Amino acid sequence: MAVRGINKVILVGRLGKDPEVRYIPNGGAVANLQVATSESWRDKQTGEIREQTEWHRVVLFGKLAEVAGEYLRKGAQVYIEGQLRTRSWEDNGITRYVTEILVKTTGTMQMLGRAAGTQTQPEEAQQFSGQPQPESQPEPKKGGAKTKGRERKAAQPEPRQPSEPAYDFDDDIPF
């Protein structure tokens, strides 16, 4: 089997504004996101830390678009997996181009961390994909410290007590 090429983009960044969701004539949802990614380095000549931010246009389709519109807000950190697409159009006789990351039903969007002003714990990241996700099984621990031929059990952290009462949201989840 010959592979003609791979078009895959992975981004981890923050939303610059709330998602813009619209519905196309067939009823499908489309969401536009503006995602900022930053990298920093130390300038070799001056020794000061430099930072460069890139802005990416991300387009989500279907259920992912609906979920993004409902749960993502400006400042939210997201993991995006999609493919690059450049399209063009005519604007008053001038050809315009835009490059976007498309996240179709085979792509992935995962909410990471928490945005400013939210109460979500960082370990409560949620992943959304256009494909059904298998139920995750806890991975068995590998290795570990041994004492005189016996495996030493790690101290189990005490469960955290929630500051607010726990609610059952299973019925309200749209996927």
From Swiss-Prot:
InterPro entries: NA-bd_OB-fold, Primosome_PriB/ssb, ssDNA-bd. It comes from the Bacteria. Residues 126-136 have a biased composition (Low complexity). A motif (Important for interaction with partner proteins) lies at residues 170-175. The keyword rRNA-binding does not apply. Coiled coil: none annotated. One of its GO terms (molecular function) is single-stranded DNA binding. Pfam families: SSB. Residues 55-61 bind DNA. Residues 6-110 form the SSB domain. Residues 113-175 are annotated as: Disordered. One of its GO terms (cellular component) is nucleoid. One of its GO terms (biological process) is DNA repair. Keywords: DNA damage, DNA recombination, DNA repair, DNA replication, DNA-binding, Plasmid. NCBIfam families: PRK13732.1 (NF010292), ssb (TIGR00621). Homotetramer. May contribute to the conjugative processing of DNA. It has a functional relationship with Psi (plasmid-mediated sos inhibition) proteins. This is Plasmid-derived single-stranded DNA-binding protein. It comes from Escherichia coli.
